[in-house]
Amino acid sequence: MGQPGNRSVFLLAPNGSHAPDQDVPQERDEAWVVGMAIVMSLIVLAIVFGNVLVITAIAKFERLQTVTNYFITSLACADLVMGLAVVPFGASHILMKMWTFGSFWCEFWISIDVLCVTASIETLCVIAVDRYLAITSPFKYQCLLTKNKARVVILMVWVVSGLISFLPIKMHWYQATHREALNCYAEEACCDFFTNQPYAIASSIVSFYLPLVVMVFVYSRVFQVARRQLQKIDKSEGRFHAQNLSQAEQDGRSGPGHRRSSKFCLKEHKALKTLGIIMGTFTLCWLPFFIVNIVHGIHDNLIPKEVYILLNWVGYVNSAFNPLIYCRSPDFRMAFQELLCLHRSSLKAYGNGCSSNSNGRTDYTGEQSGCYLGEEKDSERLCEDAPGPEGCAHRQGTVPDDSTDSQGRNCSTNDSML
C-alpha cells in the first residue's frame, strides 16, 4: 500500500540522517541506502523469479494444469505483478526519499498495490471453496467446477478486485482534507497515501477482513471434514489388518483397492496442509499491516510511519514465499527441476502428464478431485473406486498412486495439486 504521510521520516533511516553536513552521519546514510537497496533488490528478484517459475511450470506441464492450479496461477500472477509494478517503485520511494514518477503513476501505483492484495486474498477464498467442494462432494466436483468455470471465476475475481482498487482511488474518494494531505496532493514529488477515515476502514474491510473471514470459515470446515475422514481411515485400516488372510485372498480387489484409497486420502490431506500453509502465511504477513491501517485511519499520528512502512514490506515479502511453499509438492519440485535443467533424465514423459508402462503404451493421468469417505457400512468406501479390470478409468486425484490394472497398465493419479 502507499505510504502514510503523517511523518517526514523514512523506513529504518539511521540516526543522524537529518544532518548531512556531518561526515559520519552522511557516511552512515550512504551505507543505509546501499544496504537497503541490496535487500530490496533481492526481494524483487525472489518475487519475480519464483512466480515466473510457478506460472511457467503450470503452463508447460499438462500434468499441472488442474482446476486448483489454475487458481494457483492467478495467485502467482498477482504476486508477479506485485514484484514488477509495486515493490520496485516502493523501494525507489524509500531510497530516494521522494516520488519521481509523477502524480498519475502515483495513483496508478497505489491502485495496483491494492489490486494485487485484494486479488490474492479473493483467490485464496476461491481455493478454499474449491477444496471444500472437492473433499465433500468429489463425485459432483467435476461438474460443479470445470476448467472453463474456473477461468470465469478467475476473471470475476480480477474484475471485482479492479473495481475495489481503482475506482475509489481514481475517483479520489480516499482523499483526506487536512493541510498536510492537501499539500501532498498538490506536490508531484509526494506520493504519501493520505486517506480519510471512512475509506481506510471500508477499504480494509472489503479488501482484506471480509475475504479473510470467509477464507478462515471455509477452510476450518474443510479441516473438520478432513479430520473426520482421517479418523475413518484409521478405524477402517484397523479392521482391514484384523481380517483373516484367507478372507483377503477371496476378495482380490478389496485389499489393494482399500490400501490405494487410504493412501489417496492421506495424500489429499497433505495437499490440504500445503494450501493451509499458503493461507496462513498470507494472513500472518498482511494482518499486522491491515490492523495498523485501521488504527492509522482512526488516529493519524498514533502509528509511526516507520512501523507502517515496515509492516507494508512484510506483506510484500509474502509474494516471495508461495513458490517456496509449492516445493512441498513432488510434481512442482520435479517441474521446477526440469525448468532449471537440474533433473532432466527422469522427466521425459512429465510434460504431457503421461506414464509409460512395460508394453510401451502411455496412459494419461487425470486431474485432481477430492477425497471421499462414504457412510455405507457394507462397502466401507474411503475414496473413489479403483479402476476395474476393464482398464484405467479417468480417475481424478491429487497424488500419485502406484497401482496397476489387470492388464498391467499404470492407473496412477498425480500429485499435481500441491
Swiss-Prot record:
The keyword Zinc appears for this protein: no
Keywords: Cell membrane, Disulfide bond, Endosome, G-protein coupled receptor, Glycoprotein, Golgi apparatus, Hydroxylation, Lipoprotein, Membrane, Palmitate, Phosphoprotein, Receptor, Transducer, Transmembrane, Transmembrane helix, Ubl conjugation
UniProt GO molecular function: beta2-adrenergic receptor activity; norepinephrine binding; protein homodimerization activity
SMART domains recorded: 7TM_GPCR_Srsx
Motif mapping: PDZ-binding: 415-418
One Gene Ontology CC term in the entry: early endosome
Major subcellular location class: membrane
Transmembrane region(s): 35-58, 72-95, 107-129, 151-174, 197-220, 275-298, 306-329
Protein origin, superkingdom: Eukaryota
Lipid moiety-binding region (S-palmitoyl cysteine): C265, C341
Modification type Phosphotyrosine: residues: Y141
Polar residues compositional bias, start-end: 405-418
Carbohydrate attachment residues: N6, N15
Modification after translation (UniProt): Palmitoylated; may reduce accessibility of Ser-345 and Ser-346 by anchoring Cys-341 to the plasma membrane. Agonist stimulation promotes depalmitoylation and further allows Ser-345 and Ser-346 phosphorylation. Phosphorylated by PKA and BARK upon agonist stimulation, which mediates homologous desensitization of the receptor. PKA-mediated phosphorylation seems to facilitate phosphorylation by BARK.
PTM sites of type 4-hydroxyproline: P387, P400
Modified residues (Phosphoserine): S246, S261, S262, S345, S346, S355, S356
Compartment(s): Cell membrane; Early endosome; Golgi apparatus
Lipid bilayer topology: Multi-pass membrane protein
Tissue: Expressed in heart, liver, lung, skeletal muscle and subcutaneous adipose tissue.
A GO biological process held by the record: norepinephrine-epinephrine-mediated vasodilation involved in regulation of systemic arterial blood pressure
CDD domains xrefs: 7tmA_Beta2_AR (cd15957)
PANTHER family the UniProt entry points to: ADRENERGIC RECEPTOR-RELATED G-PROTEIN COUPLED RECEPTOR (PTHR24248), BETA-2 ADRENERGIC RECEPTOR (PTHR24248:SF21)
Subunit structure: Binds NHERF1 and GPRASP1. Interacts with ARRB1 and ARRB2. Interacts with SRC. Interacts with USP20 and USP33. Interacts with VHL; the interaction, which is increased on hydroxylation of ADRB2, ubiquitinates ADRB2 leading to its degradation. Interacts with EGLN3; the interaction hydroxylates ADRB2 facilitating VHL-E3 ligase-mediated ubiquitination. Interacts (via PDZ-binding motif) with SNX27 (via PDZ domain); the interaction is required when endocytosed to prevent degradation in lysosomes and promote recycling to the plasma membrane. Interacts with CNIH4. Interacts with ARRDC3.
Described purpose of this protein according to its UniProt entry: Beta-adrenergic receptors mediate the catecholamine-induced activation of adenylate cyclase through the action of G proteins. The beta-2-adrenergic receptor binds epinephrine with an approximately 30-fold greater affinity than it does norepinephrine.
Family that this chain belongs to: Belongs to the G-protein coupled receptor 1 family. Adrenergic receptor subfamily. ADRB2 sub-subfamily.
The protein's name in its UniProt record: Beta-2 adrenergic receptor
Native source organism of the sequence: Sus scrofa
Gene (UniProt): ADRB2
